[in-house]
Curated annotation (Swiss-Prot):
Pfam families: DHDPS (PF00701). The gene is dapA2. Its main location: cytoplasm. This is 4-hydroxy-tetrahydrodipicolinate synthase 2. Gene3D superfamilies: Aldolase class I.
Length: 286
């Protein structure tokens, strides 16, 4: 079954230096009512590199516990130590999750053969579904489309979060897509364009806000009503650049705290709260 729709890469709320599980529970219940297709906790937007192993597991447990609609959960699980990942992934077996979102190995700068072998080893180490995560500006390496197509032939590699930043590359992948393989944009500003070319949806940090509008854009596109989808898209697209004007997820956390969805906009270093200038800009949209 293909993954499609709007999936939320959940933020991790903090308060007084600790993970705010009360706000996190509120967050999950909030988005469960918005028509989203699933949750992706503990990824980039979740500030995962700043979490302890205990916090990581606590957040995962809370996600599963509060997922009353039994929406698919794909947990962020990536790294650049393949051998360690093949062992650590066993820890996920005890949770009721659908799969993992796994970023291209970073810092080591593997070539395409190394990238393929890395994900092949991960796929052989788990029965969970795997969604590839291609975000070269963070990892230093691009997963080329031919590599994605090769990886799609492995049974449990079921899709890609495409944040390559190059719409020419995205277009080529969509036009020459593997069978039964989901292509989900991670470039928020490309959401409508990706749907127009037959994409399956998006995993977008900006969908924390105006969530129903994102879902409407997807639903109208599925009905081939691209004109209506575009009109709805125009209502939210202008806010997207502001949400990435300063490092993600700081602007989103500010908006969620300002509107009462979470208790605090706190982040963990090296990330810091947004500037007063950006707050003024965002307040006009809230």
């Amino acid at each position: 079954m293909k993954i499609e729709g709007v999936l939320i890469p959940l933020i991790t709320p903090f308060k007084d230096g600790k993970v705010d599980l009360a706000s996190y529970e509120k967050l999950i219940r909030h988005y469960s009512k918005k028509g989203v297709a699933g949750f992706m906790p503990l990824a980039t937007t979740g500030e995962t590199p700043t979490l302890s192993d205990y916090e990581y597991q606590s957040i995962l447990e809370k996600t599963v516990e509060c997922n009353e609609l039994n929406l698919p959960i794909y947990v962020g699980f990536g790294g650049n130590n393949t051998e360690k990942m093949t062992k650590d992934i066993k820890m996920l077996d005890k949770y009721n999750i659908k799969g993992i979102l796994s970023v291209c190995p970073y810092y080591n700068r593997p070539d395409q053969r190394g990238i393929y072998e890395h994900f092949k080893r991960i796929s052989e180490s788990t029965s969970l579904d795997i969604v590839l995560y291609n975000i070269p500006y963070r990892t230093g390496r691009n997963i080329e489309n031919d590599t994605i197509r090769r990886l799609s032939e492995l049974d449990n590699i079921v899709g890609v979060k495409d944040a390559c930043g190059d719409f020419t590359q995205t277009t080529e992948l969509l036009l020459n897509r593997p069978d039964n393989f989901s292509i989900l944009t991670g470039e928020d500003a490309f959401f409508y364009s990706t749907l127009m070319l037959g994409g399956d949806g998006g995993i977008m940090a900006s969908a924390h806000l105006n969530t129903e509008k994102y879902v409407e854009v997807f639903n109208k596109s599925k009905q081939n009503d691209y004109k209506s989808a575009l009109e709805i898209w125009k209502q939210v697209a202008n806010m997207i650049p502001l949400l990435f004007e300063e490092p993600n997820p700081a602007p989103i956390k500010y908006c969620l705290s300002k509107t009462g969805v979470i208790a605090s906009e706190a982040l963990r270093l090296p990330l810091v709260p947004i500037s007063e200038n950006l707050k003024e800009k965002l307040n006009k949209f809230l």
